[in-house]
């Protein structure tokens, strides 16, 4: 559960509606793979991940980024039940994919960075704080199965 004020909820909802979510997802996942190269081990089937330009242009990275951001978007619709919303994905990433749960936090930070880049001056410190709460809640929900 994420505790947002009414103003924070309005900020998150309003700003989220201004971005192309698919682009945010693709760029955030790409940045994760570039900035934290050890995360690439989970994506060995994605082909060429040899350089930043290869990663950012990789169609499989873009497609998976879209999938990731669609799940994030679902979370935005269920902020009061993130654990329930992400229960299946938490189980999948824990039991089958064996993803280090710290990566969820790192990806959340990449989403915030990309939002800041795309929204510019509209992404105020208060907006960033609201989105940080959301991505922290999503990361916690995704890591729930690990506890």
UniProtKB/Swiss-Prot annotation:
Tissue-specific expression: Red blood cells.
Residues where heme b binds: 64, 93
CDD domains, per the entry: Hb-beta-like
Modified residues (Phosphoserine): 13, 51, 53, 126
GO biological process, one term: hydrogen peroxide catabolic process
Boundaries of every Globin domain copy: 3-147
Gene Ontology terms, MF aspect: heme binding; hemoglobin alpha binding; metal ion binding; oxygen binding; oxygen carrier activity
Pfam entry (one): Globin
Phenotype upon changing residue 21 to P: In strain: Sprague-Dawley
Positions carrying Asymmetric dimethylarginine: 105
Residues annotated with Phosphothreonine modification: 124
Family per similarity comment: Belongs to the globin family.
Complexes and interactors: Heterotetramer of two alpha chains and two beta chains.
Function: Involved in oxygen transport from the lung to the various peripheral tissues.
PANTHER family: HEMOGLOBIN FAMILY MEMBER, HEMOGLOBIN SUBUNIT BETA
Protein name per UniProt: Hemoglobin subunit beta-2
